[in-house]
A protein has these predicted regions:
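Long, low-complexity intrinsically disordered regions enriched in Ser/Thr/Pro/Gly
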Residues: 125-126
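Divalent cation-coordinating acidic motifs and surrounding scaffolds
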Residues: 129
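Alpha-helical assembly-interface signal, strongest on the long, hydrophobic N-terminal helix that forms
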Residues: 3-19, 27-38, 42-120
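N-linked glycosylation sequons
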Residues: 58, 102-119, 133-140, 145-167, ...
């Protein structure tokens, strides 16, 4: 009652009492919650040391991966450089093989020249900061025959050599292995490498494509030779009294028999071995142009397409009148040069209506020309000669429709 009496006498006491009796908010300490059974003192979170260790481990792993990536990239680049080297050596060696065929060198002499050329050009290419040599040891430089049908390189056909295989090494005592940047870390300080390339002169010509531009021509003479005469030449049954030496014709045999391309008994009067490759207007100007410059793009377009054998291995060309004395100067100007001529099996018809059945294209060298005087004294003397046939169509059926003709050197493996 005393408290109530006091309030009645002084009403301000109500606000003071209210304030004194109002509950205060509880103070909650910032500690980690504990189980009721956990009597240990509170623990605070401290993990900065673990993150540092993990970071160091990740950096180490990344450094190893980076080192592997750099070395693998270097190996890849070096392998590409080595392949470029073997390609260069094989191409150069195969062109040297062609030159050896032109010069009539023996297989042993050709092999020596090929080896020199392979090393000369191969050693010009840098591989992993050094210049590897191509050594003529073991089977690193091999002559052989490349079969375009089976795509196999055969070393058992020496008479048909048309390809060169070159191996280039960077291993051991042969040019040394390729050094690596992080070899110590990865446990391997060097990497051995080998690259093999095969270059070939394909000699199964099946015809000729139409040149892509007007500036390109085919080195074909529009004069055909009968098959029997050509076979006699190949078999060595004709005379061998002339040869081309040091830029001139000499009266000395060279192991290659000659024949007279001037028409001799083709069986078609008025068509002494001349064929139309292009326009059929019998123009002496056209023939003169073809002798000097070759068969043009327009000439083949006049024939409605490429000059190609059919499935029976035959190509039909219309006959033109005999070789005119009007092209004597043009023929004399190409003495010593090589040309392609068609070989026919038979001819049917007379005059401009004659049709020649062409069965082969062959490479020859012009040695003598005489188109004036008595008929028996006229001649257009040629001998077999290896030559490059550009725009050639390659036969892929295993049949050969050419002699002494080769495509430009190409990489086949």
């Amino acid at each position: 009652m005393s408290r109530l009496s006091a309030i009645l006498k002084n009403p301000n006491l109500i606000f003071r009492v209210s304030t004194e009796t109002r509950p205060q908010p509880a103070h909650i300490p910032c500690v980690i919650a504990k189980s009721r059974r956990d009597t240990s003192p509170p623990r605070r979170c401290k993990r900065s040391g673990s993150a540092s260790v993990l970071g160091i481990m990740l950096i180490s792993v990344m450094a190893v991966i980076l080192g592997m990536t750099i070395d693998l990239g270097y190996i890849h680049v070096s392998q590409s450089e080595l392949r470029r080297t073997s390609d260069s050596a094989a191409l150069a060696a195969c062109w040297e093989l062609f030159d050896a065929k032109v010069d009539g060198l023996s297989d042993q002499e050709a092999a020596q020249q090929v080896a020199v050329s392979a090393d000369l050009f191969g050693s010009q290419n840098k591989v992993a900061q050094s210049y590897p040599h191509v050594y003529d040891q073991g089977d690193d430089i091999t002559l052989g025959y490349y079969d375009v049908v089976t795509r196999q390189f055969d070393t058992n056909s020496p008479a048909d050599i048309n390809a060169v295989r070159v191996n280039v090494h960077r291993q051991g005592h042969t040019n040394g292995e390729v050094p690596l940047f992080f070899g110590t870390v990865l446990g391997r300080q060097t990497q051995p490498m080998t690259s093999t390339s095969i270059a070939a002169l394909l000699n199964t010509v099946n015809g000729f494509y139409v040149p892509a531009t007007d500036s390109q021509t085919l080195d074909i003479l529009p004069f055909a030779l009968d098959e029997d005469t050509w076979q006699s030449v190949v078999d060595g049954e004709t005379d061998d009294s002339l040869s081309w030496s040091n830029g001139q014709v000499v009266a000395t045999g060279n192991g290659k028999c000659e024949c007279n391309l001037y028409p001799q008994g083709t069986g078609s009067p008025g068509n002494r071995g001349t064929v139309d490759i292009g326009s059929s207007n019998n123009s002496t100007n056209d023939i003169a142009r073809q002798i000097l410059s070759g068969i043009s793009r327009d000439d083949l377009l006049d024939l409605n397409g490429p000059l190609e054998f059919n499935v029976n291995g035959e190509l039909f060309l219309n006959g033109d009148t005999g070789i005119s004395a009007g092209v004597k100067d043009e023929l004399e100007s190409i003495i010593g040069e090589t040309r392609i001529i068609p070989v026919f099996r038979e001819v049917n018809g007379n005059g401009n209506n004659a049709v020649y059945t062409i069965v082969k294209f062959v490479g020859v060298r012009i040695l003598a020309v005489k188109l004036t005087g008595r008929m028996s004294g006229k001649c257009l003397t040629v001998e077999p000669a290896p030559m490059v046939a550009r725009n050639a169509i390659v036969s892929v059926d295993g049949n050969s429709y050419s002699d002494y003709l080769y495509t430009p050197v190409m990489l086949v493996d």
